[in-house]
Amino acid sequence: MNSPIQIWTCAAFHPAYGCGGWASVRSAQGQLTGAAGGQRNTTARRMALAGLAAALRDLPPGGKPIASGPIDIRTTSPELALFADVLNSLGQPTQSAPPGEDLDLWAPILTASAGRRLTLVRIPLEPGTPMAFTAAWAELARDKAKAGGAFTAAIPKGNLAKVPGLRLQVRAAD
């Protein structure tokens, strides 16, 4: 079995302004990727789902070598943790149906989960961890969305390389 794909995802939401941000970092076979985004007139739940959907969006189908391993998802989001039973059942013979709301965000999650085992765990936010890095980017994304509206951007590889607990594998020159 291939090594697991690890995902750290966080969401930040400001209820007074109705704006939110999300960030996710993914480690798959030593390759790190990260993205952040945000929008106005949203909910905390949509931001949590958007972060997970973004982390899963460009994975190859479950039968491909990089993607055949399980997906371990770590989050601090209570909104995403509410869906733990649904997410943990994806890819299993007795799969739970996703909620009927936010289907635009559930679609990429369901597509990416085909043929894979997902495990979602809510963890505490501790300084100097990949989760703290992801939470900081989610807060930055929330503030940027409040000021400028909807956006999505990649987290620079240079920033990912500095995260304690993550190792960035540099591709050899072709």
Where are these predicted regions, by residue range?
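Short, electropositive alpha-helical surface patch
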Residues: 130-148
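Short, low-complexity, polar/charged sequence segments that are solvent-exposed and flexible
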Residues: 25-28, 43, 91-94, 139-143
